Each structure stands twice: as structure tokens, then as C-alpha cells.
């Protein structure tokens, strides 16, 4: 009888420990969420300026993400309304995330995303944090990619500001190239030190 009681307590203790370990692991990355919608065939961010720890002043507007000093984050972008009424359009899908404008005080031109003109040292910081797939365009490797959700990782080793550009495509029923839309707020990294 004592053995059964001890075994039961040990099992309950192990389950509690495993639950705590899973909960700690799940929250260790401090997930950030940005919500987007298609409004009149344009990609619009509906998250508030303060949803992801950005201050009201100098935040870069809706969709701004601040990762505090010493934190790491997974950034998830969700597309809520994906209706496409453009020529032969079917629906919008999230396609990619690009970074650019290293420490730029203003939003870079959409065609100027990437790190082709960024110093190697500064590019290395961004690449270590975000895992860049293509330096020239700033394309980021995703940790999750679905039709209405895309996720990227941010290790936040260094302090800097970088802008991100979300790409949504509207596939066409006629087989022609898809329609492409972008939205581009910023990420403010607090760094590890």
C-alpha cells in the first residue's frame, strides 16, 4: 500500500514538473502577435501601436514590435480577412517577411529592403537574431508558414531597430502572376546586454 502511495506521489510530482517545464519552454520565447487584414485589396495592420510593448511616441505606428532587453521572441503575423477581388483573384495568403532599414529613423522605401549596403558587422547582428535567408532582399527564414499565419524568430542579441515588410499574395485563377501587397512596420530590439 505504501509503495502504491509513493508511486502515485512520484507520478504526480513528475507530471507537475513536466507541466512546469513545458509551460516555461512555451513562454520562454515571449511571443509577439501582429494581426493583419485585407481591406479594399490592401494589406492593413489592425494591431494597436501598444500591443507589442512599443511606446506611443516614436513607435513606428501599428505593428511595431519591441523586444525588451534580455528577451527572445517569436513573432507571429496573422491574416484575418483574406478576400481578394482583384482581377481573377482567389484569396490572399501570407508569403514572406523581409527585413531592412538597419537603424533607420524612417520607413525605408519598399524596394530598398535588405542589407546589400549595410556593413558586414551590422548585417551579422541582424542575421544572428533573425536568420536571414537572402542578404540582398532581407528575406527571413520562417519558423512557421501557413496560408494565414507566418512566424519568424528573434534572438535579440544586439540593440538596434530594423523594419520588417510582410508580403501577401493574391493567387489568380487565370494562372498569371499573383497580385502582391506589402505592409511594413518596425522591430526595436533591446539586445542581450
Regions found by a protein language model. Name each.
Residues 26-27:
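Signal peptide cleavage region of secreted peptide precursors
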Residues 74, 86-120:
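Extended low-complexity, serine/threonine- and proline-enriched intrinsically disordered segments
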Amino acid at each position: 500500500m505504501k509503495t502504491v502511495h509513493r508511486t502515485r506521489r512520484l507520478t504526480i510530482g513528475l507530471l507537475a514538473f513536466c507541466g512546469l517545464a513545458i509551460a516555461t519552454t512555451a513562454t520562454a520565447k515571449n511571443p509577439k502577435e501582429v494581426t493583419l487584414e485585407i481591406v479594399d485589396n490592401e494589406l492593413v495592420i489592425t494591431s494597436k501601436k501598444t500591443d507589442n510593448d512599443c511606446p506611443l511616441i516614436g513607435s513606428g505606428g501599428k505593428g511595431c514590435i519591441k523586444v525588451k532587453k534580455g528577451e527572445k521572441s517569436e513573432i507571429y503575423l496573422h491574416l484575418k480577412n483574406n478576400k481578394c477581388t482583384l482581377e481573377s483573384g482567389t484569396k490572399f495568403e501570407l508569403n514572406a517577411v523581409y527585413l531592412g532599414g538597419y537603424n533607420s529613423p524612417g520607413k525605408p522605401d519598399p524596394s530598398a529592403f535588405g542589407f546589400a549596403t549595410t556593413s558586414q558587422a551590422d548585417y551579422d547582428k541582424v542575421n544572428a537574431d533573425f536568420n536571414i535567408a537572402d542578404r540582398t532582399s532581407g528575406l527571413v527564414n520562417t519558423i512557421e508558414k501557413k496560408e494565414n499565419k507566418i512566424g519568424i524568430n528573434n534572438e535579440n542579441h544586439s540593440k538596434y531597430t530594423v523594419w520588417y515588410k510582410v508580403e501577401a499574395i493574391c493567387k489568380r485563377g487565370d494562372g498569371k502572376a499573383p497580385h502582391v501587397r506589402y505592409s511594413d512596420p518596425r522591430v526595436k530590439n533591446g539586445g542581450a546586454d
